[in-house]
Swiss-Prot record:
Pathway linked to the protein: Amino-acid biosynthesis; L-leucine biosynthesis; L-leucine from 3-methyl-2-oxobutanoate: step 2/4
Assembly: Heterodimer of LeuC and LeuD.
Protein name: 3-isopropylmalate dehydratase small subunit
Gene3D superfamilies to which the protein is assigned, alphabetical: Aconitase, domain 4
Catalytic activity: (2R,3S)-3-isopropylmalate = (2S)-2-isopropylmalate
Record NCBIfam families: LEUD_arch (TIGR02087)
EC code(s) of this entry: 4.2.1.33
Similarity-based family: Belongs to the LeuD family. LeuD type 2 subfamily.
GO biological process: L-leucine biosynthetic process
InterPro entries named among the record's database cross-references: Aconitase/3IPM_dehydase_swvl (IPR015928), AconitaseA/IPMdHydase_ssu_swvl (IPR000573), IPMI_Swivel (IPR033940), LeuD (IPR050075), LeuD_type2/HacB/DmdB (IPR011827)
Superkingdom of origin: Bacteria
Residue stretches in coiled coil: none
Amino acid sequence: MNEKFSGKVWVLGDDIDTDIIIPTEYLALKTVEDMKPYAFSPLRPELAGQIKPGDIIVAGKNFGCGSSREQAPEVIKALGIKCVIAKSYARIFFRNSINNGLLLIENADLHDEVTEGDTIDVEVNAKITHNGKAYPIASLPDNLVDILNAGGLVKAMRKLNGLD
């Protein structure tokens, strides 16, 4: 996965839990599309309506903490977010995101140096560039790259088993 892209940054803080990403009361809605307007609503009610396809979330530490719910990465992906860059992730959220085809990147420094609305350039498995400064990215293991390239775990397994 050596993809390159640029995107507008939305900055979020530390400990953004799954109840903030998609509150419990909206989990009963029929589709992820129905849930999209309520994403991040406890923190920033207007945010879901402002995000455009290709935008990037830059967050602090422990992004995706709280209860395990597959709808959290699904709704982020449905909003059109290209990737989330955070200082760290809750482990279950990390795997749920990969399994749903949402790219997550860890970087300890970018959050403290980026401003909401900035544009950053991402070279997956290489670096992030912001205002001329490069931030290295650790490579993801090959098995996770394969899942992301397929669009998620179910699609990767279908491909592996010759069903697609």
